């Protein structure tokens, strides 16, 4: 209860008055859980909570509650991904959902800084380890089947999330380049059908980072964006009537050097927009579309919290919970998991009518 109350206070402040990193003392300290995880996805199934994250064959943790204690119980895959590209041993940014008794774990394979990527899926009748079947790639960018079709010829196909509306599934994905996209899944929730003429929706795009780094000069066209770096990724869509909320991880992610951090404000932060349609357009508090660089800053670095992101939303009996990972200023190489209540009744998603 202390953890939830403290985090709720934090979000009452941060959601209503977007706290800048330059004023870390204005935000309470986040209460850490015992779970070290990057890009978590959390579900409630069979009377327990399961967290899936980046790690060998997609690591699974289990806990009796969101606050833990968390215990590593195994992995989704029992061997490397069958997709022949990227980091097959440690797939990125998994998202797990349950539809009609089947569990679907969507994952990414890629190499850092390049868009020769793919999103795959594994299925099981149980949320825990064992019994998962790897079905391979759903969509690909850079190379592979369908990668020359719109929008896959301009996106980085990683960071999957799936929104379910009725009996329909919508695959949300993207990182840097042209930003965040959504395409419809087939009824099997494991394929998108013919990629030619696919009904794709553009959801968000970063306006461009002016600062130049070595990646901008990479001779491989799949490992640079000639229009400039556009750091937005990790999208997730939640629903709280009457709006759909598009949550984004905005800024530079991962592998921070505590002695050489990015310029203030360029590290990960959580932003959001909303729409009455699951396909957008999503707008921020000022009415700016997220495809035009909009996005309300909900939570950024403060106190000892550095670069929060990799967020998702889970609905429990008490309401909607936003979970995310973050690093510590003093030791920014590990990602920690925590969560906070979302209070829509108080207007604390920054959309105060």
From Swiss-Prot:
<keyword id="KW-0325">Glycoprotein</keyword>
<dbReference type="GO" id="GO:0045493">
    <property type="term" value="P:xylan catabolic process"/>
</dbReference>
<dbReference type="InterPro" id="IPR023296">
    <property type="entry name" value="Glyco_hydro_beta-prop_sf"/>
</dbReference>
<feature type="active site" description="Proton acceptor">
    <location>
        <position position="39"/>
    </location>
</feature>
<comment type="pathway">
    <text>Glycan metabolism; L-arabinan degradation.</text>
</comment>
<keyword id="KW-0624">Polysaccharide degradation</keyword>
<keyword id="KW-0378">Hydrolase</keyword>
<feature type="active site" description="Proton donor">
    <location>
        <position position="233"/>
    </location>
</feature>
<feature type="signal peptide">
    <location>
        <begin position="1"/>
        <end position="16"/>
    </location>
</feature>
<dbReference type="GO" id="GO:0046558">
    <property type="term" value="F:arabinan endo-1,5-alpha-L-arabinosidase activity"/>
</dbReference>
<keyword id="KW-0326">Glycosidase</keyword>
<feature type="glycosylation site" description="N-linked (GlcNAc...) asparagine">
    <location>
        <position position="194"/>
    </location>
</feature>
<dbReference type="InterPro" id="IPR050727">
    <property type="entry name" value="GH43_arabinanases"/>
</dbReference>
<dbReference type="InterPro" id="IPR006710">
    <property type="entry name" value="Glyco_hydro_43"/>
</dbReference>
<comment type="similarity">
    <text>Belongs to the glycosyl hydrolase 43 family.</text>
</comment>
<keyword id="KW-0858">Xylan degradation</keyword>
<dbReference type="GO" id="GO:0031222">
    <property type="term" value="P:arabinan catabolic process"/>
</dbReference>
<feature type="region of interest" description="Disordered">
    <location>
        <begin position="202"/>
        <end position="227"/>
    </location>
</feature>
<dbReference type="Pfam" id="PF04616">
    <property type="entry name" value="Glyco_hydro_43"/>
</dbReference>
<dbReference type="GO" id="GO:0005576">
    <property type="term" value="C:extracellular region"/>
</dbReference>
<keyword id="KW-0964">Secreted</keyword>
<protein>
    <recommendedName>
        <fullName>Probable arabinan endo-1,5-alpha-L-arabinosidase B</fullName>
        <ecNumber>3.2.1.99</ecNumber>
    </recommendedName>
</protein>
<keyword id="KW-0119">Carbohydrate metabolism</keyword>
<comment type="function">
    <text>Endo-1,5-alpha-L-arabinanase involved in degradation of pectin. Its preferred substrate is linear 1,5-alpha-L-arabinan.</text>
</comment>
<feature type="site" description="Important for catalytic activity, responsible for pKa modulation of the active site Glu and correct orientation of both the proton donor and substrate">
    <location>
        <position position="159"/>
    </location>
</feature>
<keyword id="KW-0732">Signal</keyword>
<dbReference type="InterPro" id="IPR016840">
    <property type="entry name" value="Glyco_hydro_43_endo_a_Ara-ase"/>
</dbReference>
């Amino acid at each position: 209860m202390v953890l939830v109350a403290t985090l709720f206070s934090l979000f009452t402040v941060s959601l209503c008055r977007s706290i800048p990193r330059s004023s870390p003392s204005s935000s309470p300290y986040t209460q850490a859980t015992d779970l070290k995880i990057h890009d978590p996805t959390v579900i409630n199934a069979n009377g327990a909570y399961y967290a899936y994250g980046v790690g060998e064959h997609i690591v699974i943790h289990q806990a009796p509650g969101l606050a833990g204690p968390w215990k590593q119980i195994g992995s989704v895959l029992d061997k490397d991904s069958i997709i022949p590209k990227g980091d097959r041993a440690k797939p990125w940014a998994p998202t797990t959902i349950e539809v009609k008794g089947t569990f679907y774990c969507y994952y990414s394979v890629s190499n850092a800084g390049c868009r020769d990527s793919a999103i795959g899926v594994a299925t099981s009748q149980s949320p825990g380890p064992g019994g998962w079947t790897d079905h391979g790639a759903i969509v690909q960018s850079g190379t592979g089947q369908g990668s020359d079709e719109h929008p896959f010829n301009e996106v980085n196909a990683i960071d999957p999330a799936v929104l379910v509306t009725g009996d329909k599934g919508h695959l949300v994905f993207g990182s840097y380049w042209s930003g965040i996209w959504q395409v419809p899944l087939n009824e099997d929730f494991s394929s998108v059908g013919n990629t030619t003429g696919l009904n794709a929706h553009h959801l968000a795009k970063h306006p461009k980072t002016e600062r130049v780094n070595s990646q901008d000069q990479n001779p491989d066209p799949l490992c640079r964006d000639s229009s400039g770096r556009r750091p937005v990724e990790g999208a997730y869509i939640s629903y709280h009537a009457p709006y759909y909320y598009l949550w984004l991880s905005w800024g530079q992610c991962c592998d921070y050097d505590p002695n050489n951090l990015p310029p203030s404000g360029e590290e990960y932060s959580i932003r959001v927009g909303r729409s009455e349609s699951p396909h957008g357009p999503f707008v921020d508090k000022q009415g700016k579309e997220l495809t035009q660089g909009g996005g309300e800053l909900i939570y950024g670095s403060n106190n000892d919290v550095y670069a929060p992101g990799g967020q998702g939303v889970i609905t429990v009996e008490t309401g909607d919970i936003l979970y995310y990972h973050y690093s510590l200023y003093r030791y920014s190489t590990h990602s920690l998991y925590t969560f906070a209540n979302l209070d829509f009744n108080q207007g604390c998603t920054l959309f105060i009518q």
